[in-house]
């Protein structure tokens, strides 16, 4: 009997490591089933033995069977064959490795070329013990230089190079053969060997082509020891196996033939290839046998080599691709594996799945947010396997009867033996009788849990759990709010739905992935969903000031509010008629005690300060106190997706379920209001008034005129270029500015003209659709169209379109659209507009692919990073990435933005607000009540405590300002203290005007105690203490400053009670916010970074400002950072200055000049070469004067200079700009050319700055002829010098820095923040230099540069200059810049995790294949990313082992990955199991089929030996739930109970738990310690275990499933498995924690035949009991299980037996002979007289029977108020462990106990039994039965021990 829940398959073991290796020829033969030797496939229409479709290799067609394993098409996995190659060939995948190994070993003797005892080799072996790949690389580096086999040491003829090698000294023994080694080269798929010239080999050619055969011989000689040294493995991967001698032929299942109708079979590509190989192989064998010429054989071998190579890889560079006849390239094995569609990524990492549906989505605002409307057709098609149990058998039977055609029905029944019954084709489904243990695949029904998903799945909120609601028609319906996390809209989007197939999965989705649980995203700690669309628009309209609702409409709205408590609020206006405001309606929707302060979107900032800041004239301050909307218009700022808004607060304060309902209620109520109120939009809304249009036209006319002026200026050269820009750029920037200004101005005037009631405006203001710019484009003017960030470029000759004149730079021709959408665009405007739009589309398409790849890489790099149980963040190799997640160990979901009250204020304010002065009596009396003042004055340590608090606060402030030197950090911490204080004030009704009774000493001690409880890192060693201090530092600072004594008594005014509540609340919230172990934070971080990247715009924006510097931003920059690219697009330094240079622009300019690279070219005006033979009398007129002066005192020999002259004229303006002098330049020239060039130059103040250079020639004494030649060369030479000087002569600066811009920042982020003497923050605008190009090291060494703040944006450079920690911070800063540039925000912990992953190893790991795949993770993970086949080949060569720890590996192997709920094991406490309670597994119909299948075979279980009624029963064992062992309703149960009858506590053997055949024995609580029902064995005073003892009552407050007394049905016990189909969490009738109720117990199930409350005398195990036998009496002597007439299959024992029907009349509830089979105990049936509340021995008021008493020890043993005959030693007087208040018959939630049930009318005198499983039709319990009547004297609600409010019996539970 297999486990229920597993179709009958072989049990699977988990793979815990994967060993890679190469298949050796022997192994291939051993695993082969067929020797393939013929290329043919069929012979005479039959598959040919030994052919390529050998029937031993697998099944060929659907009807066939496999000859090896006799399986059919679905069962047979296929079997390998083999084919032997005539000659060995290279394996193309191992060719480069073979080459490397050849170079490491001797070509003749196969020894290693270096000595293993060499210290360097030893060192390598030691270093690379776990890394064979690295070992080969290092050994190869040592070997490749060797040209002789080692050990030629003692040859006489002084051999080259290695004699003097220190490694050879003192070595005498010859290790190798001493022969020369060839050098090897790979050509295509051949290897060539070549020897050096001096080789004295026996007349051998110097160059040969190495055959695979020869290489094989070399490899075979390598010893095992050497194999290990070269990083291979003698067992799994020997070098000789890298050469193919035997090829495995893949099974048929891998290469199925494609059968096309009507034509022949098309064979698979692999089959084609194999047939080529076989043909070539046969030809080679034939030729070899016939003794063909050598070159013929060589050609054959090469052909064979080619075919074998292209079988593996068909994309080898330098080889023709193998093709089919049609010319299509064949798909080789390598192509099958690699890429997105390949085996690994396409079939192992991601698969197509069953039980999924896909259709279009539509909106339905009336559904709750976690519900999805599913079309009936889909619901009828998707099924859920439900296990039949006695509780749901009738319900499922009903579904089975309906079959597959009607909804709701069922599709299949799966019997216990795994047989499937398809109800679609079953002739009479109604005849199929279900038995417990069967599985019914029923249709999806309302309330099922599903997973809903929309691609692209960018973050975890793209797959969420929903509940099903079956609706008509064919689309998925979903709530509008849920569209935003899915990023869905209803313009035709499709979504996928997956129906989980096990209860475990359902439980997991329900507890982790449901929509309400994902309301807040950890990405940015804010809600992911808000109110959208019409509801948002309406909520703003409804909460405006003048919205009134009359009585009927109010009633109508209240009807839409499910949480309405029945009280109509007081109307705001009473006369003339009652009217409610919209705000009041909104207040009704707000749940609970919520306090929020927000602003409306139109809130003017000026209102926040000033005398009237409490009054909001425009009603723009949204104030919600205690769940009442007091003021303000609600818009998207309050109910949108922003952090800290109403939805966020509700979710944090009141939990996810209430928040989810809040979303739904807002929508239902407000849509109902909108439906009546209406909202529309039409052309009327787009029309402004006449004056506005005039205004707009004037603005545009003026703008055009301005542009014309600028063009004029540019033409006349009056336009000054801005620094760093050319004239043209400056002009364009100016024009752009004018035109954008014009658009904005027209837009704002258009908006001003719109009235408050304009519908466009109402949508924009509420935030539901559109923005200001949309309005202005519709009404005023569309504005400038841009392409690539510039105006429309000239496309025709010097113009944009043919209708414009050439060189028209005016607004119209360059794409300014002056019309509005309303007015309509002219054709040329339309064309330009289309150009702009097209660019956007292209951009989006390109961006999607880019960011998709970035996201994939991020995920792959971080997929296995998770929080461990020790709180650290580690990857799959257990390498630490972070000590605590996010450095504070908190989950991103529970933190909020908070501000530090002590950071900003200056010293005076700080002291005023935070310093408590206990000596100031006036202050104390004003703020504290008398007794507190007295306490303060009496306390000895009061003053010192308060003083220590103040010094702590000062220290905190100092630290804060050190941590956040800018004073503006966005601090995210859990527990929003301001709001908690506000809540406390509301809950405890704090009066802010009264003095408080909260002692400051109590505050200080309370806060200190609390901060000790906030533990992130536990442990007492120094490191743990330091880590704990670091992790909680900010939280503690916040706590101490917010909850300081001064604040508490002045602003918060909490009383002692409220303060204590506050501390408790903070502690709870903090604990809740700690990150959960198992949380996959890596994937989360990758998604949180990838998702905003997708929203980023791709192209780089050039923002024109003061600094005209271009900065790469957006996706390209993100790529640069995570690729760690060496070549940045725009490398740049930001140089901060110190001292005078920072303040004084002139000094700053000095530094700039020092940095900026200046060549001669930059300062040169023009150059010329003259022939000027006489130096003194120059031919250049303007130079004459100064040259003659210069030569009056010649400083060098004029005779030797060349007649050719290079004259350079410099630009004075630039010289001054660069702070250069002529002297400096002359020095540079002299430095560069020395004595070869004569230079004379003008003075710095001369009119023109001129340099004259001549080449210093030889003496003039040479002949004229030669001179002429020289002269010719001179001028050419001069030309070269000129070119060289202009470009290469560095005058000053750093060559890498091409340009430096100088600017003074106007925003705070670049300013220097200083702390003033008063203690406030002040931003100082220093001069900043920004450079193009970087040279950080050089710049840092310059003077007047602030070395601390100067940074580079090139992370590689920072790494080289400043090291790994600096680069970590730098990456974080750069990433943050990229993300925050377009206003996104990502929580710090995600960025930090990425930075840590990139730098954890001490070097920069790029997020590319070069970084990710160079980690030491398993080969399977690496191959799932990129370079699939190469990695697998490498792994097999080095015989790597994959430990299968990561996520990818487990997914490939189909195992549960060690992450999330899979990252821990559950351990069974065997000791506890001894106290378990056994459920008889074998009472019904044939073994414990519902016991989760733990019972053995039916026959064994039913054998009489296992059910001893009276046979040899020891007193210690009492039958599981039944007072008599079996279910015998023996007379012994009559209240007069004879002690030796069947009910005697001493012989209740039942299925004794120790019975060897009973697998559940181990769990049985009835071991001797807890045995029997007799007082001797189980005395009421036993402290241990009774079902109603508080330890064991699930509803009892002290009951916890982990309680030591309880291990019965805890989730760890095998009999209780959430996946057991009978255990349905939604089952109303049972409490899963009730140990006495095991859902899987057969004996206890209302629908189980053995336990039918309506058949008193029916015991399924009684052989003599045939339901139709009239003479059968429960006390019949023939009732013995050993009776031969009893057989479970006997016809009389049939569940369908006519009289065994739940309505069987033979059952009378008061039958004394019937021991009611109450679900948790046959012994307890409320309607059975044996247990009658009025029975003296069982009286609830008896002190001994107290459901809450831990021991049943009566306080006075003989006293029982209503039981005169009560005797504490009576075996009856124990509270039966079988009776549990949570048992279904006795549980208000049980179907058989429903107050609304017709039978349960307290006045119902009669009691009609009716089918057991319909809720509310209990057969056991009639409230009016005298034995159990609330009016019965012994059961009085006032009875202390048994009152309905007693914790164990709670009607609400």
From Swiss-Prot:
- Identify the stretch(es) annotated as Lid loop: 256-268
Phosphoprotein listed as a keyword? yes
Residues that hold Mg(2+) 2 according to the record: 489, 491
- Recount the PTM note: The tandem 7 residues repeats in the C-terminal domain (CTD) can be highly phosphorylated. The phosphorylation activates Pol II. Phosphorylation occurs mainly at residues 'Ser-2' and 'Ser-5' of the heptapeptide repeat and starts at the 3- to 4-cell embryonic stage. This phosphorylation also occurs in the early stages of oocyte development and is not detected in oocytes arrested at the meiotic diakinesis stage. In the somatic lineage, phosphorylation at 'Ser-2' is mediated by cdk-12 downstream of cdk-9 whereas in the germline lineage cdk-12 phosphorylates 'Ser-2' independently of cdk-9.
Q: What is its main location?
A: nucleus
Pfam name, any one: RNA_pol_Rpb1_4
Q: Where is the composition biased (Low complexity)?
A: 1589-1811, 1821-1853
- Sequence similarity: Belongs to the RNA polymerase beta' chain family.
Q: What is this protein called?
A: DNA-directed RNA polymerase II subunit RPB1
């Amino acid at each position: 009997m297999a486990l229920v829940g597993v179709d009958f398959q072989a049990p699977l073991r988990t793979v815990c490591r994967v060993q890679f290796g190469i298949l050796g020829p022997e192994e291939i033969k051993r695993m082969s089933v067929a020797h393939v030797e013929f290329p043919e496939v069929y012979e005479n229409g039959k598959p040919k033995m030994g052919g390529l479709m050998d029937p031993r290799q697998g099944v060929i067609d659907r009807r066939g069977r496999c000859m090896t394993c006799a399986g059919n098409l679905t069962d047979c996995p296929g079997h390998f064959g083999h084919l032997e190659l005539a000659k060995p060939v290279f394996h193309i995948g191992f060719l480069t490795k073979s080459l490397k190994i050849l170079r490491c070993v001797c070509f003749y003797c196969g020894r290693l070329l270096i000595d293993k005892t060499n210290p360097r080799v030893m060192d390598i072996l030691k270093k690379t013990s776990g890394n064979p790949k690295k070992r080969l690389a290092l050994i190869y580096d040592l070997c490749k230089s060797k040209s002789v086999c080692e050990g030629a040491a003692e040859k006489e003829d002084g051999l080259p190079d290695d004699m003097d090698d220190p490694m050879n000294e003192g070595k005498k023994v010859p290790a190798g053969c001493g022969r020369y080694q060839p050098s090897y080269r790979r050509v295509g798929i051949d290897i060539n060997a070549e020897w050096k010239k001096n080789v004295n080999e026996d007349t051998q050619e110097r160059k040969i082509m190495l055959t695979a055969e020869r290489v094989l011989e070399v490899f075979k000689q390598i010893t095992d020891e050497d194999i290990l040294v070269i990083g291979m493995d003698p067992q799994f991967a020997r070098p000789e196996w890298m050469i193919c001698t035997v090829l495995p032929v893949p099974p048929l299942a891998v290469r199925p033939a494609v059968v096309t109708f009507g034509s022949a079979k098309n064979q698979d590509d692999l089959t084609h290839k194999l047939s080529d190989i076989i043909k070539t192989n046969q030809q080679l064998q034939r030729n070899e046998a016939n003794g063909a010429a050598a070159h013929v054989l060589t050609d054959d071998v090469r052909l064979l080599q080619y075919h074998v190579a292209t079988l593996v890889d068909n994309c080898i560079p330098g080889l023709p691709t193998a093709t089919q006849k049609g010319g299509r390239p064949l798909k080789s094995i390598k192509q099958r594996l690699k890429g997105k569609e390949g085996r690994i990524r396409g079939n192992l990492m991601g698969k197509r799945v069953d039980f999924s549906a896909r259709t279009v989505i539509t909106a339905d605002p009336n559904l709750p947010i976690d519900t999805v409307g599913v079309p009936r057709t889909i619901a009828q098609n998707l099924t859920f396997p439900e296990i039949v149990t006695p509780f749901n058998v009738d319900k499922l039977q009903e579904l089975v009867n309906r079959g597959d055609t009607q909804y709701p029905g069922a599709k299949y029944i799966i019997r216990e033996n795994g047989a499937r019954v398809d109800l679609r084709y079953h002739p009479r489904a109604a005849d199929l009788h279900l038995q417990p243990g069967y599985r019914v695949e029923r249709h999806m029904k309302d309330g099922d849990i599903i997973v809903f998903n929309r691609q692209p799945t960018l973050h975890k909120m793209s797959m969420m759990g929903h509940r099903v609601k079956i609706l008509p028609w064919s689309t998925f319906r979903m709530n509008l709010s849920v569209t935003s996390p899915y990023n869905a809209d209803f313009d035709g989007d499709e979504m996928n739905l997956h129906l989980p197939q096990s209860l475990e999965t359902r439980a997991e989705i329900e507890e982790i992935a449901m929509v309400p649980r994902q309301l807040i995203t950890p990405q940015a700690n804010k809600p992911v969903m808000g109110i959208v669309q019409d509801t948002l628009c309406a909520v703003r309209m409804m909460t405006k000031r003048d919205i009134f609702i009359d009585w009927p409409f109010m009633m109508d709205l209240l009807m839409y509010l499910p949480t309405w408590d029945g009280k109509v609020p007081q109307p705001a206006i009473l006369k003339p008629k009652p009217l409610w405001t919209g705000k009041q309606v909104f207040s009704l929707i707000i749940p609970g005690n919520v306090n929020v302060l927000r602003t409306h979107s139109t809130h003017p900032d000026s209102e926040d300060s000033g005398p009237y800041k409490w009054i909001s004239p425009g009603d723009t301050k949204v104030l919600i106190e205690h769940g009442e909307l007091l003021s303000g218009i609600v818009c998207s700022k309050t109910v949108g997706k922003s952090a800290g808004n109403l939805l966020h607060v509700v979710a944090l304060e009141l939990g996810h379920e209430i928040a989810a309902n809040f979303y739904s209620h807002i929508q239902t109520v407000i849509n109902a209001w909108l439906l009546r109120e209406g909202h529309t939009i039409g052309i009327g809304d787009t029309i402004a008034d006449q004056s506005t249009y005039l205004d707009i036209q004037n603005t545009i006319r003026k703008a055009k005129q301005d542009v014309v002026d600028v063009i004029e200026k540019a033409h006349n050269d009056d336009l000054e270029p801005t620094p760093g820009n050319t004239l043209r750029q400056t002009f364009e920037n100016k024009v752009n500015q004018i035109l954008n200004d014009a658009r904005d101005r027209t837009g704002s005037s258009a908006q001003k003209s719109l009235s408050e009631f304009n519908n466009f405006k109402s949508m924009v203001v509420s935030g539901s659709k559109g923005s200001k710019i949309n309005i202005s484009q519709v009404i005023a003017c569309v504005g400038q169209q841009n392409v690539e960030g510039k105006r429309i470029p000239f496309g025709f000759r010097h113009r944009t379109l043919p209708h414009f004149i050439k060189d028209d730079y005016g607004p119209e021709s360059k794409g300014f659209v002056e019309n509005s959408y309303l007015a309509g665009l002219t054709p040329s405007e339309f064309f330009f507009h289309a150009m702009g739009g097209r660019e956007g589309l292209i951009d989006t398409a390109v961006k999607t692919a880019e960011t998709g790849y970035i996201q994939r890489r991020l995920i792959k790099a971080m997929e296995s990073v998770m929080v461990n149980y020790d709180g650290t963040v580690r990857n799959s190799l257990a390498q630490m990435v972070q000590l605590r997640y996010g450095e504070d160990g908190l989950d991103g979901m529970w933190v909020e933005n908070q501000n530090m009250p002590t950071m900003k204020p200056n010293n005076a304010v700080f002291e005023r607000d935070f310093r408590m002065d206990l000596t100031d009596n006036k202050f104390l009396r004003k703020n504290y009540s008398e007794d507190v003042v007295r306490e303060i004055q009496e306390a000895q340590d009061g003053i010192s405590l308060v003083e220590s608090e103040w010094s702590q606060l000062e220290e905190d402030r100092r630290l804060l300002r050190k941590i956040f030197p800018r004073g503006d950090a966005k601090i995210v911490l859990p527990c929003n203290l301001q709001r908690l204080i506000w809540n406390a004030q509301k809950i405890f009704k704090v009066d802010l005007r009264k003095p408080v009774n909260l002692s400051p000493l109590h505050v200080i001690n309370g806060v200190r105690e609390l901060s000790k409880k906030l533990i992130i890192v536990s442990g007492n060693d120094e490191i743990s203490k330091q880590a704990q201090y670091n992790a909680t530092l900010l939280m503690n600072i916040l706590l101490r400053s917010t909850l300081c004594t001064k604040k508490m008594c002045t602003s918060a005014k909490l009383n002692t009670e409220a303060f204590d509540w506050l501390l408790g609340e903070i502690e709870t919230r903090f604990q809740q916010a700690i990150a959960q172990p198992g949380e996959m934070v890596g994937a989360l971080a990758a998604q949180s970074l990838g998702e905003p990247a997708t929203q980023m715009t791709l192209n780089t924006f050039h923002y024109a400002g003061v600094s005209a510097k271009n900065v790469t931003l957006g996706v390209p920059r993100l790529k640069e950072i995570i690729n760690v690219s060496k070549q940045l697009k725009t490398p740049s330094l930001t140089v901060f200055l110190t001292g005078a240079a920072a303040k004084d622009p002139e000094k700053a300019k000095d530094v700039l000049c020092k940095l900026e690279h200046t060549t001669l070219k930059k300062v040169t005006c023009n150059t010329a070469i003259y022939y000027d033979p006489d130096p003194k009398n120059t031919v250049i007129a303007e130079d004459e004067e100064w040259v003659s002066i210069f030569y009056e005192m010649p400083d060098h020999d004029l005779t030797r200079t060349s007649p050719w002259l290079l004259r350079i004229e410099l630009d004075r303006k630039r010289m001054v700009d660069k702070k250069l002098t002529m002297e400096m330049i002359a020095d540079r020239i002299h430095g560069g050319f020395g004595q070869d060039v004569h230079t004379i130059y003008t003075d710095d103040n001369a009119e023109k700055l001129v340099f004259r250079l001549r080449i210093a020639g030889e003496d003039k004494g040479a002949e004229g002829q030669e001179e002429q030649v020289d002269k010719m060369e001179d001028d050419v030479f001069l030309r070269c010098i000129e070119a060289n000087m202009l470009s290469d002569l560095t005058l000053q600066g750093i060559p890498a820095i091409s340009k430096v811009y100088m600017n003074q920042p106007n925003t705070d982020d670049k300013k220097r923040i200083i702390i003033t003497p008063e203690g406030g923050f002040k931003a100082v605008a220093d001069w900043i230099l920004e450079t193009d190009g970087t040279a950080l090291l050089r710049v840092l060494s310059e003077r007047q540069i602030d070395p601390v703040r100067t940074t580079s944006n090139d992370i590689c450079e920072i790494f080289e200059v400043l090291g790994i920690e600096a680069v970590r911070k730098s990456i974080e800063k750069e990433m943050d810049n990229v993300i925050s540039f377009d206003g996104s925000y990502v929580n710090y912990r995600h960025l930090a995790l990425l930075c840590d992953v990139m730098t954890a190893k001490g070097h920069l790991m790029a997020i590319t294949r070069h970084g990710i795949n160079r980690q030491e993770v398993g080969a399977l993970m690496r191959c799932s990313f990129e370079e699939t086949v190469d990695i697998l080949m490498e792994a097999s060569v080095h015989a790597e082992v994959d430990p299968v720890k990561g996520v990818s590996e487990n997914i490939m192997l189909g195992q549960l990955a060690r992450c999330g709920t899979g990252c821990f094991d559950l351990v069974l406490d065997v000791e506890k199991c001894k106290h378990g309670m056994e459920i008889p597994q074998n009472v019904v119909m044939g073994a414990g089929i519902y016991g989760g299948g733990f019972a053995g075979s039916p026959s064994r279980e039913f054998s009489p030996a296992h059910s001893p009624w009276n046979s040899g029963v020891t007193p210690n064992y009492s039958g599981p739930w039944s007072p008599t062992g079996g279910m015998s309703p023996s007379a012994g149960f009559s209240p007069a109970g004879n002690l030796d009858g069947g009910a005697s506590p001493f012989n209740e053997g039942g299925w004794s738990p120790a019975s060897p055949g009973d697998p559940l024995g181990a769990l049985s609580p009835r071991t001797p310690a807890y045995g029997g029902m007799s007082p001797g064995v189980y005395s009421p005073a036993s402290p241990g275990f009774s079902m109603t003892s508080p330890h064991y009552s699930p509803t009892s407050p002290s009951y916890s499933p982990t309680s030591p007394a309880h291990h019965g049905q805890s989730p760890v016990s095998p009999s209780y498995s959430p996946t057991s189909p009978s255990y349905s969490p939604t089952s109303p009738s049972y409490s899963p924690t009730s140990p006495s109720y095991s859902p899987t117990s057969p004996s206890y199930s209302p629908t189980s035949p053995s336990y039918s409350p309506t058949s008193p005398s029916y015991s399924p195990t009684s052989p003599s009991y045939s339901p139709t036998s009239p003479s059968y009496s429960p006390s019949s002597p023939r009732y013995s299980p050993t009776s031969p007439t009893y057989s479970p299959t006997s016809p009389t024992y049939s569940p369908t037996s006519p009289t065994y029907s739940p309505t069987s009349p033979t059952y009378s509830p008061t039958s004394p002979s019937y021991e009611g089979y109450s679900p948790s105990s046959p012994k307890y049936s409320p309607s059975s007289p044996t247990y009658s509340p009025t029975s003296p021995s069982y009286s609830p008021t008896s002190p001994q029977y107290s459901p809450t008493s831990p021991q049943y020890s009566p306080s006075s043993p003989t006293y029982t108020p209503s039981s005169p005959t009560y005797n504490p030693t009576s075996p009856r007087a124990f509270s039966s462990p079988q009776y549990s208040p949570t048992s279904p018959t006795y549980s208000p939630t049980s179907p058989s106990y429903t107050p609304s049930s017709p039978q349960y009318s307290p006045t119902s005198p009669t009691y009609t039994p009716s089918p057991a499983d319909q809720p509310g039709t209990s057969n056991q319990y009639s409230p009016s039965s005298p034995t159990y009547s609330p009016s019965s004297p012994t059961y009085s609600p006032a009875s202390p021990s048994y009152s309905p409010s007693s914790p164990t019996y709670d009607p609400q539970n």
